[in-house]
Regions:
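Structural/interface elements that position substrates and couple domains in central-metabolism enzymes
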Residues: 2-456
């Protein structure tokens, strides 16, 4: 990797970079694009993005390396809510000549990419066990996009990544192929802004940020993004757009960490942290409410700040605030287990052999996603402590923890529990049965009406 995780002066870095040795024929556009756009990666971001673009009337090619994933999408087995499954079914039956829009084609054949006028790269960018970026999928996707790039195309990276990545994985390799970016081909970075399960802020209404290598790159990328965003906000460079995404999710991680700390302090003082935060939120300026919880999950908040920290370490720059916040956030599941032991002890019940149910294992309400969910670590730690653990989640049928597959309890209210951990409450969830449970550990801080309720 040219930057080796370092923050560099991107202007000097790229001004001295040699152009490719194989010139390509100048072309303003490809005359026979069969698709308006191709979306590379059909996961939690790529598939909704492809659907939004198709819904706007564009001809969309959806590309994923996994034939199994494509088969699941076609069969309606994909990790989508019911409404989105219906959108997929409708899109797949739309004929290219239909007046409602264009084609919606799913494939694992990357050789079709030259038929798309724009290519959106929407693949996961997780972290590894050392908290360093795992760029395996991103490198592969960008390499595929570059290998199949043709004059007149616009390539847009949307995956969260380090500052300088767009130039490293797209701009440089394209130049090595002989393209002149901004003339033959166009490159931009537009970080995804999708919040699964959020019906209030849907993708088509949320503004998008875009930074391009040249003004023409921005113009072309924005023309596409306007089809699936509320508006488009242009910044001066791809690096500014990359840093924007890191700032957004680091902001959330730091504030969640502070909310957790205030929750612990408030419990010690006998105060209700939810009441405190709600009261503070009446201030119309200088405040934004963040609520405490059992930890953070998904592939955004637990991961994205580590892309920045990794890059800073490469430049021998420290960020103690962010580092401390991420350490505290990561330690939250351990705190949950400690509180379980304490609450059970208050009832003279030993953790060993205790019957514990986790209510909700998805990382957030309204989704079936368990990636990086704190619930998984909580389950594993409870088992190590000797507890017998079950879970109940109306959106998640099974989870695998420590090599053991668990199945959701269908009727949790009909069984006897020593303690129930309320981890995730999906919209419309029935919690009336919790009033009959002897001990409830409410990690959502939202069930103040329960008699036998404890908080973290």
């Amino acid at each position: 990797m040219p930057t080796n995780g370092r923050i560099v002066d991107m202007r000097a870095h790229h001004a001295n970079r040699p152009h490719g040795r194989m010139p390509v024929q100048r072309a303003a556009a490809h005359a026979s694009f069969a698709y308006d756009t191709a979306v590379v990666g059909l996961g939690y971001v790529g598939l909704p993005t492809a659907l939004a673009l198709h819904d706007s009337g564009l001809r969309v090619l959806g590309l994923d390396v996994s034939d199994a994933r494509i088969a699941d999408i076609r069969a309606g087995r994909a990790d989508l809510l019911a409404a989105d499954r219906q959108r997929v079914a409708s899109a797949l039956t739309t004929d290219a000549a239909d007046e409602s829009g264009g084609a919606f084609v799913l494939t694992s054949d990357a050789s079709l990419l030259p038929e798309a006028e724009t290519v959106l790269v929407c693949v996961p960018t997780p972290i590894d066990e050392h908290l360093a970026p795992d760029l395996t999928a991103l490198r592969a996707a960008c390499r595929t996009a570059v290998e199949h790039a043709v004059p007149g195309q616009t390539l847009v990276l949307t995956s969260t990544t380090y500052v300088g990545c767009t130039r490293d994985l797209l701009v440089g390799p394209l130049r090595d192929r002989g393209f002149e970016v901004g003339v033959d081909i166009f490159v931009a970075f537009a970080p995804e802004r999708i919040d699964p399960g959020n019906d209030r802020h849907v993708q088509q209404q949320v503004p998008r940020v875009v930074g391009g290598v040249t003004p023409e790159c921005v113009k072309r990328a924005a023309a596409l993004l306007e089809h699936c965003a509320g508006s488009v906000h242009a910044v001066s460079s791809v690096e500014a757009a990359e840093m924007t995404k890191l700032y957004e999710n680091t902001f959330r991680a730091v504030n969640i960490s502070m909310a957790n700390e205030f929750a612990d302090i408030s419990r010690g003082l006998g105060l209700d942290i939810t009441e405190v935060i709600t009261a503070a939120a009446t201030k119309p300026y200088g405040f934004m409410p963040f609520f405490p919880g059992p930890g953070v999950g998904g592939h955004c908040i637990p991961c994205d700040p580590h892309y920045l920290l990794w890059q800073l370490r490469g430049d021998r720059v420290s960020s103690p605030l962010i580092e401390t916040a991420m350490t505290l956030v990561a330690g939250r599941p351990t705190k949950v287990v400690q509180r379980v032991v304490e609450v059970l002890a208050e009832r003279e019940t030993c953790i060993v052999g205790a019957r514990v149910l986790i209510r909700g294992v998805a990382y957030k309400p309204g989704v079936a996603d368990v990636r990086e969910s704190p619930a998984l670590e909580i389950i594993e730690r409870l088992r190590r402590a000797g507890a017998r653990v079950w879970f109940a989640d109306e959106l998640v049928d099974t989870v695998r923890v420590g090599g053991v597959e668990m199945t959701s309890v269908a009727e949790p209210g009909s069984m006897d529990w020593d303690l129930v951990i309320v981890h995730t409450l999906h919209p419309g969830a029935d919690v009336s049965w919790l009033s009959n449970v002897p001990a409830v550990l409410d990690t959502t801080y939202r069930l103040g009406e329960l008699t036998h309720r404890s908080v973290l």
